[in-house]
Structures are given as C-alpha cells and as structure tokens.
Design a protein with these regions (language model features):
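Short, structured interface segments
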Residues: 158-169, 312
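C-terminal functional regions that serve as terminal interaction/effector modules
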Residues: 152, 220, 249-252, 258-334
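A short beta-strand element within beta-rich, extracytoplasmic domains
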Residues: 79-90, 150, 239-249, 299
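Beta-sandwich interaction modules
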Residues: 78, 120-157, 227, 238, ...
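Predominantly extracellular/luminal cell-surface or secreted proteins
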Residues: 87, 102-106, 164, 246, ...
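Intrinsic, low-complexity N-terminal interaction/targeting segments
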Residues: 50-54, 110-137, 203-222, 269-288
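Short, surface-exposed beta-strand/strand-loop-strand elements in extracellular ectodomains
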Residues: 94-107, 253-265
Length: 334
C-alpha cells in the first residue's frame, strides 16, 4: 500500500523508544502490550491456548452489553502527533468496526486512575476500520502530548497501534549545556538519506543501544563509485565536543570509513570529523578538536553498510537554547 508521508515520522509510542500500555479495561484473549511492539505482527495458524487462537495483538472479549473497550498508552517520546495507524493485521472476523483516538498532556507520572479522570482531547473521531489492514488516520494538532487513548467500538482485536509524530523534549528535564544534540528524543530529526533499503535512518538517533542489527540503519550494497549518507537537523544550534559512531552488531557489513560534516543552514557544509576508518561491531568515540557552531549534521559512510547509532555530544548556543525552549512552550499551548 502507498503509505502516507507522515508515517515516515518516528513512532512515539513504540516500546523501542520507551512507550508503555499502562492500562486496558479488557485483554482476555490477547495482551495489551502487543499493541506497541516494534516488529510487524505475526500469525501462526492453529496456535491455540486455553482461551482460543493466540493473536499477536490486543484482543478483548465479545461484549454482551453496550460500551467500548479502551487502552491508554504512555508515549515513550512525548511530542506532536502527525498521524496514527490502527493495524488490524490478521484480525478478520474479530476486528472492531470502529475506533477513535484521544490524547492528553500531563507532567510527572500519573497512575491509570489519575489519567482516566483527566479531560482528553479527540485526535481521531469515531472512524470505520477495515479488517486485516493498516488503517491510517492523519492528525491535525500542533500540541505536545504525553499519553494517547485508543478506543475500539465495541470490542475486538487490534494488532498494532502506531503513533507517528515529532518528539518535543522538555527543557526542564535536560542539561542543555551537555547532552546529545543528535538525539531523536531531544527533537533532532532526519531530513534526508541516500538509502533506507533495510531499515530507517531514524534508528540511528533512537534512544538506547541497538540490541540487534535490525535496530540500526543499513543500506543496500552499492555497485557504483558513490557512498551513502544521512542528514540530520539537530535538536538545536550547538557546539559539539564528542562524536560517537556505533557499528555494534554490524560485522560483515559495517562501513569501512565514515566522516561528519556540519552546517548552520543545511546547505553550506564544513568538516566536523574527517574521513576515518571504522571497525566492525564497535562503539567508536572521537573528541572533536576544533568544535564549531552547527545546527545540521551529515554522516557519510564509505561506501555503504550499516550503523547502529550516531551520537553528537555538546551544548546548545544561546540562540539554540532560546529556540529549544520556545519549541516546547509553543507545543504546550499549540
């Protein structure tokens, strides 16, 4: 299927970035935690447990009275939601005919009971679903959200719930003088890449370590004289002091070399790290001897291959701090 452009935005709810399904009113047939698993749903015919066919998703019992079923997800990356996907893969005679999505923004770590008592904002009104399908719904909201609530009408099964968007970090929870300028969770974003054949370049700047090769960025094998690259708009204008290029899990397919370039406008580039030899399955750390202000970063790998993570440690400039803080404030009132 042709996927909407906004599905290229990271999944703010994914377990891989720290999301959690904190509550569901019912999960008799299949556990709520399946909703945010990062991998694609699977189906194994004739795999029955003591409650029936085992599904890789969230499935509630058949309702015999009016009502709806709900699940609340705490976003691993609070941010502006651009769209959601309600994936009913492999649910055919037992998918919900309708779904709706709401959101709320709250500080701290409220309990499910406290969350349920809040006033929620509708992101997706009650909308029809198709069975065994990805059901995408674009969202028009400029606010920063911390939790979303999926309602299914009246009951049934959903394989995955994807909440795509742009992370917006809370400056009150960060040391803006020393943090990862290229981190997705801090608001950095991929603006371009030469190739994403095996996996998304968003993985490069995702939280935590990659646990397997598939959690990094890997390109197809090149058969020409070129090289692959990724460009990133940083969390804000800053001065980097240390770069980390991590090839963990990439053994026979790590790049041979890499370089870093910086820019203040995304068009005019200067050298940050010269072309440097890399080793397979290794976290490389490079102090930057002549740090300069930059707002964009370009990673070039030679000629192709896979990288697990890219980190760029440093501090925001005065202008970077101002823009970083204003982005958060604007999304709070959006």
């Amino acid at each position: 299927m042709d996927r909407p452009e906004w599905t290229a935005d990271p999944d703010l709810a994914s377990r891989r970035v720290g999301g959690s399904v904190v509550w569901a009113n019912d999960e008799l047939f299949a556990e709520r935690e399946n909703l945010i698993k990062p991998e694609q749903p699977e189906f194994r015919p004739w795999s029955f447990g003591h409650k029936g066919q085992i599904y890789d998703g969230w499935e509630t019992r058949r309702r015999r009275e009016p009502g709806i079923d709900q699940a609340i997800v705490r976003l691993g990356l609070p941010g502006v939601v651009t769209g959601v996907v309600v994936d009913t893969a492999f649910f055919t005679g037992n998918y919900p005919p309708f779904a709706s999505v709401e959101a709320v923004a709250v500080d701290g770590y409220p309990s499910p009971g406290e969350l349920s008592a809040l006033d929620w904002t509708t992101l997706v009104p009650k909308s029809a679903l198709k069975g065994d399908s990805e059901n995408p719904f674009q969202v028009s909201s400029s606010r920063r959200w911390t939790h979303v609530r999926l309602s299914i009408h009246p009951d049934g099964g959903v394989a995955r719930f994807r909440v795509h968007g742009r992370p917006v970090a809370d400056p009150r929870l960060l040391d803006l003088g020393s943090f990862d300028l290229a981190a997705l969770e801090h608001g950095a974003r991929v603006t371009g890449a030469s190739n994403m054949f095996y996996s998304s370049p968003n993985n490069l700047i995702s939280p935590g370590f990659a646990s397997v090769m598939g959690e990094g960025w890997e390109t197809a094998r090149r058969r020409d004289d070129g090289n692959d690259w990724v460009e990133i708009a940083l969390a804000g204008e800053g001065v980097p002091r240390l770069a980390e290029l991590d090839t963990s899990h990439f053994k026979g397919n790590a790049p041979g070399w890499a370089s870093l370039s910086g820019s203040l406008d995304g068009e005019t580039w200067f050298e940050v790290l010269p072309r440097t030899r890399l080793q397979p399955d290794t976290r490389h750390r490079f102090p930057l001897e002549q740090p300069r202000e930059l707002s964009h970063l370009r990673l070039d790998i030679y000629p192709d291959g896979g990288m697990a993570r890219l980190r760029l440690y440093g501090g925001l400039t005065e202008r970077g701090r101002s823009e970083f803080t204003e982005r958060f404030r604007a999304a709070q009132s959006g």
